[in-house]
Amino acid sequence: MLGGGLVGLAILFFVLALIFAILGARGVAGMSMSVAKWLVIIFIVLAIISLLL
């Protein structure tokens, strides 16, 4: 998988969002982009927590 873990999934959903936006499927692109955004936020929070512990 690309990058492994949450970052890989975020990149995957981002690429899917770009592909769907190009193809004109705005609803699917928006949903993929929101999933990617939340995965990145979760990854950042977990990274900060792991640095503090």
Curated annotation (Swiss-Prot):
* TM ranges: 5-25, 33-53
Q: Where in the cell is it found?
A: Cell membrane
Question: According to the lineage, what is the superkingdom?
Answer: Archaea
Q: How does it sit in the membrane?
A: Multi-pass membrane protein
| InterPro entries in the cross-refs | DUF1328
Principal localization reads membrane
Keywords assigned by UniProt, alphabetized? Cell membrane, Membrane, Transmembrane, Transmembrane helix
GO cellular component terms, A-Z: plasma membrane
UniProt lists the family membership as follows: Belongs to the UPF0391 family.
NCBIfam families given in the database record:
PRK13682.1-4
Which HAMAP family does the entry mention? UPF0391
Q: What is this protein called?
A: UPF0391 membrane protein Memar_0049
Q: What is the lineage of its organism?
A: Archaea, Methanobacteriati, Methanobacteriota, Stenosarchaea group, Methanomicrobia
